[in-house]
Amino acid sequence: MEVKIFKLSDKYMSFEIDGITPSQANALRRTLINDIPKLAIENVTFHHGEIRDAEGNVYDSSLPLFDEMVAHRLGLIPLKTDLSLNFRDQCSCGGKGCSLCTVTYSINKIGPASVMSGDIQAISHPDLVPVDPDIPIVKLGAKQAILITAEAILGTAKEHAKWQVTSGVAYKYHREFEVNKKLFEDWAKIKERCPKSVLSEDENTIVFTDDYGCNDLSILFESDGVQIKEDDSRFIFHFETDGSLTAEETLSYALNRLMDRWGILVESLSE
């Protein structure tokens, strides 16, 4: 198995993986979608009653939205994630919640103001802050305030969508186009759309050895004189993350996770 990365940023990756079967490619796709752990807020405690600021002014902690709606919004906010944390049900604390499996947050703000994701303060793990500080949560009116504490734990998208790291996970076969110059008159225009590194040409034919990196080869799918070959052992993937993990961390975890699962399967079959 060989992996070749085409594009890489913190939140996006496109790559080619060679030497796997279609079923293994689909297993990687499914792992990227629903088997990558991330932090998400699971428990929220609201302080109800009067709240006083440093000057003794009194504010009402009642919110314009139901507590359940605010808690739901908090759960969907992407948080920076540390994969060294334990799943709570696998932690040495027995699921009670500790610094090895639980991250504590708080919000303390008075109105009139808009409460944003940037107002979420990480208490136990200062680096594990919201990815985007500008996500709106709730709007406070005059004499309104919010005071909450929240706990975030690791989970996967198999349990709930709030633990889904990736979006737009897709793949396709590696394609090669062989174009007959006599039957396809616009071959020269298509040639200009591709880098020289993916071109192979003689007097009668031109071959595009890789459609990745070319600017729109869709016309070749409907034209005479074009032979398309697909390699079912080479796949081009692309996906995005919500920023809780980098794209590189996400792919690395997915590949290691697959190797572990296949290893367990082989051991079970050998028994």
UniProtKB/Swiss-Prot annotation:
Its EC number is 2.7.7.6. SMART domains: RPOLD. It holds the Pfam family RNA_pol_L. It is found in: Cytoplasm. One of its GO terms (biological process) is DNA-templated transcription. GO terms for molecular function: DNA binding; DNA-directed RNA polymerase activity; protein dimerization activity. It is an enzyme of class 2 (transferase). Its main location: cytoplasm. NCBIfam families: PRK00783.1. DNA-dependent RNA polymerase (RNAP) catalyzes the transcription of DNA into RNA using the four ribonucleoside triphosphates as substrates. This is DNA-directed RNA polymerase subunit Rpo3.
